[in-house]
């Protein structure tokens, strides 16, 4: 989820345009920034770790005239945040400079090949591999060279490339990563999103997957995946900057909810091989699962609820004792830890202090530690024995949505990986579990298309003051996350309970005007959930069902969020997306600040 900008124009103000554009995409989150521009002496790169201000201060006394350049803000995925790992990247001969958003899956094998040919690398990134490969394959023509490069690499990407032999142009391409072209008067632009170039143009071409585009100040030439020159539609953008920074969405939260299909696909593509086997050998090097007899999953808030889903997966698939604990309590619960214990610590930011302290405690007791985090180079990833990164990209809204689903999906894949290592999962079942991930993505897309139905429900419940979220089995874990979302951004008191536990006290609180969200994705327990619904309906509750097709729940509730079957283990994840929408639209109707709810912080760094 990096920020990209490129410029080719008749005015020698490329550096100014690039720095201004990068400032406009700071909202996406980043850990370093850099630009490359063409001068009379060749290509010059300037880049700095940290905030864009560091780069600006570094360059404040520079006097540079340049008509072509590219700029980038980086969110690290390969190589920790440092000056040398920041983009852009040179080839060894400095004839090529390149920026990249995405992940190159087979970079290691290409890097090995280039090293054997004597190429010297100056960073730890997958991106530099592409710059070096482009230089090696260069045949004097930018387009034909790029096509040769693209045939060698696998992954998701948006590239912008400049070459010293063609000082007036950029060549760019995209594959499952956003890239647009902005059209101006004797100046043209490329960017990852509209906000970077809105000051200069509102005429935008949205490139499609497989497109390659050559950009000069006066010409834009687009080739499609079949290498045919095509004319893409030019669209007039009517957004203002604030809207553009959110990609046209009203809030970051709904934008991030709707990025989940892309994240599901990316996670599947990056963490499975061509045969769709989970490939965590590198991430889990040194961990012998035959020696593990107990697993702990430790986290806070939404990450903890993702951990509950992970616990369910592992207990069902592995037959190993798996425990979850809240990080602030873990050290004080006297967990039984030996050198046969695997302790998994989940933190979006990688800086959650309770989780860090719990990991320190587990290491001291002899546990093998695994971090699951969204931020490369964060404290938790440096201190754990092993790390698996979620691929959610920066999450701006305080209420977590896409980070949750990416954490759950990583733990799902981890369960399959361990199960395969231990011989616990039959091949036909393994392939079904993997194929369910693609099914989940398709069904999230379908749910997004039906979101206005959930908006209509939100209009009816917006004035409710108290509520309960109920579920059985894995759905009780769904209830917890759904309840948290409603609390976080609506300030409605809600409580999540196992549905069968309601009658043991809490049913005394059910009366007219109380909201009950009843969740049922396991049809074996559907009739029991229906019975619980009838109990609360008889006492005046307004009941919203959240269930999969085939459930009896729609027959007995006031409103329903119905989702398609995405497999036994992943349908609950789809249901959570529906509950994210319910919380979002309720907050929208109440007029609250969806992205910045009161009293909450994105990263909790104090105990």
Each language-model region and where it sits:
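Glycine-rich phosphate-binding loops that contact phosphosugars or nucleotide phosphates
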Residues: 287-439, 519-559, 564, 582, ...
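Structural motif
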Residues: 68, 96, 294-296, 342, ...
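Hydrophobic alpha-helical scaffolding
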Residues: 8-11, 100, 120, 136-139, ...
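Generic C-terminus detector
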Residues: 227, 542, 556, 566-607
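Active-site phosphate/pyrophosphate-binding segments
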Residues: 260-264, 268-296, 386-515, 588-607
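Conserved short alpha-helical segments that host acidic/polar catalytic motifs at enzyme active sites
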Residues: 1-246, 250, 262-293, 305, ...
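Glycine-rich oxoanion-binding loops at beta->alpha junctions
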Residues: 71-84, 274-287, 310-346, 493-509
């Amino acid at each position: 989820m990096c920020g990209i900008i490129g410029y080719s124009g008749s005015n020698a103000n490329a550096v100014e345009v690039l720095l201004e554009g990068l400032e406009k995409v700071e909202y996406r989150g980043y850990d370093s920034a850099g630009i490359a521009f063409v001068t009379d002496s060749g290509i010059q790169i300037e880049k700095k770790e940290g905030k864009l201000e560091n780069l600006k201060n570094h360059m404040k006394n520079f006097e540079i005239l340049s008509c072509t350049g590219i700029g980038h803000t980086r969110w690290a995925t390969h190589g920790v945040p440092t000056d040398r790992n920041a983009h852009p990247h040179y080839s060894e001969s400095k004839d090529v400079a390149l920026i990249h958003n995405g992940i190159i899956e087979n970079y290691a094998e290409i890097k090995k090949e280039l090293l054997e040919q004597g190429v010297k690398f100056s960073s730890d990134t997958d991106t530099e591999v592409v710059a070096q490969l482009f230089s090696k394959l260069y045949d004097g023509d930018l387009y034909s060279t790029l096509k040769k490069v693209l045939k060698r690499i696998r992954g998701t990407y948006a590239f912008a490339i400049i070459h010293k032999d063609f000082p007036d142009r950029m060549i760019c391409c995209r594959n499952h990563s956003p890239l647009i072209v902005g059209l101006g008067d004797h100046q043209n632009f490329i960017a990852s999103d509209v906000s970077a170039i809105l000051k200069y143009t509102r005429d935008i071409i949205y490139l499609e997957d497989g497109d390659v585009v050559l950009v000069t100040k006066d010409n834009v030439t687009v080739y499609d995946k079949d290498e045919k020159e095509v004319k893409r539609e030019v669209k007039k953008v009517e957004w203002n900057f604030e809207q553009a920074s959110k990609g046209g969405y009203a809030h970051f939260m709904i934008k991030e909810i709707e990025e989940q299909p892309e994240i599901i696909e990316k996670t599947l593509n990056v963490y499975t091989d061509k045969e769709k086997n989970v490939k965590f050998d590198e991430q889990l090097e040194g961990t012998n699962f035959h020696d593990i007899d107990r697993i702990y999953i430790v986290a806070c808030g939404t990450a903890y609820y993702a951990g509950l889903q992970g616990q369910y997966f592992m207990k069902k698939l592995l037959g190993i004792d798996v425990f979850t604990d809240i990080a602030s309590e873990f050290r004080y619960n006297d967990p039984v830890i030996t050198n046969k214990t695997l302790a998994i610590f989940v933190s979006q930011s990688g800086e959650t202090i309770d989780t860090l302290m719990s990991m320190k405690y587990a290491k001291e007791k002899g546990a093998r530690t695994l971090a699951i985090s969204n931020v490369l180079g964060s404290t938790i990833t440096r201190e754990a024995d092993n790390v698996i990164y979620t691929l959610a990209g920066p999450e701006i809204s305080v209420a977590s949505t896409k980070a949750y689903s990416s954490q759950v999906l990583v733990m799902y894949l981890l369960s399959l990986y361990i199960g395969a290592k231990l011989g616990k999962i039959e091949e036909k079942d393994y392939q079904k579990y993997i194929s369910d991930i693609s099914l989940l993505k398709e069904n999230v897309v379908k749910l997004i298309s039906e979101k206005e139905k959930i908006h209509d429900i939100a209009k009816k419940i917006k004035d409710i003051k108290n509520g309960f979220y109920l579920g059985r089995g894995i759905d009780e874990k769904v209830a917890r996350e759904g309840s948290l979302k409603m609390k976080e951004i609506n300030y409605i008191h809600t409580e999540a309970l196992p549905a069968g536990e309601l009658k043991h006290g809490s049913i005394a609180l059910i009366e007219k005007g109380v909201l009950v969200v009843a969740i049922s994705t396991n049809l074996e327990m559907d009739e029991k959930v229906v019975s619980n619904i009838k109990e609360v309906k008889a006492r005046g509750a307004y009941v919203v069902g959240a269930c999969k097709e085939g459930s009896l729940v729609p027959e007995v509730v006031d409103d329903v969020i119905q989702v398609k079957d995405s497999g036994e283990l992943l349908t609950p994840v789809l249901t959570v997306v529906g509950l994210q929408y319910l919380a979002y639209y309720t907050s929208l109707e109440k007029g609250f600040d969806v992205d910045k709810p009161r009293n909450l912080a994105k990263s909790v760094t104090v105990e």
